[in-house]
Amino acid sequence: MEIKVGSIVRSKAGRDKGDFFIVLAMDDNYVYMANGELRKVDQPKKKKLKHLQGTEQVSEFIINKLSQGGKVTNSEVRKALAQAGR
């Protein structure tokens, strides 16, 4: 499963193992992700790609907002994860 901005991913390693997050930004080896609760949008978790498992789900709302240069809020991240059943 390809991981991109707006993807819902599950952590495979670390103390957040098993938790779901939304990818907010990416670079070559790392993703920056938040869940709106413990990992807030203003301090996203930096994690290596190999420590993540992609899901089939993406948040179109988050993708659209970030692509238009908007700022995503913690409540929007929580809502997107809840709508995805996570």
Show where each model-derived region lies.
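Ferredoxin-like alpha/beta domains used as RNA- or RNAP-binding modules
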Residues: 1-5, 12, 22-86
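Short, charged beta-turn/beta-strand-edge "cap" motif at the junction between a beta-strand
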Residues: 14-17
